[in-house]
Amino acid sequence: MIKDIAFTAYPSDNVKSTREWYEKMLGLKFSGAFEENGVEMYNEANVGPSCFALMTSQWVQRKPGTGVGVAFEVDDIEKTAKSLRDAGVSVEDIYTTPVCKVTSFDDPEGNKVTLHQSTR
């Protein structure tokens, strides 16, 4: 079911300024913003075979500084989400971007787990 870790994400109240800090301080090269209404909501930098992402705190529903999230790469997000729902897990609606599909759910401890399916 799980193939790989797709990305690690930090929540950010201001993705643009946080991205600029990571670019300046750590030399990360981000691939391009995903924006809504002119606001940078998500951006990622390739790091080895995976990537590091900055994501608006409203998407991940966590405040900055509250920990790292994990996103597991799957072959078929619809099938995986259905399987989880059938097992009684409350899975969020699948969100589609120009490059991927994403959904999330909480583990038994309340940690947010994300499923990711690349569409590129």
Model-derived regions: residue spans:
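Vicinal oxygen chelate
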Residues: 1, 31, 81-120
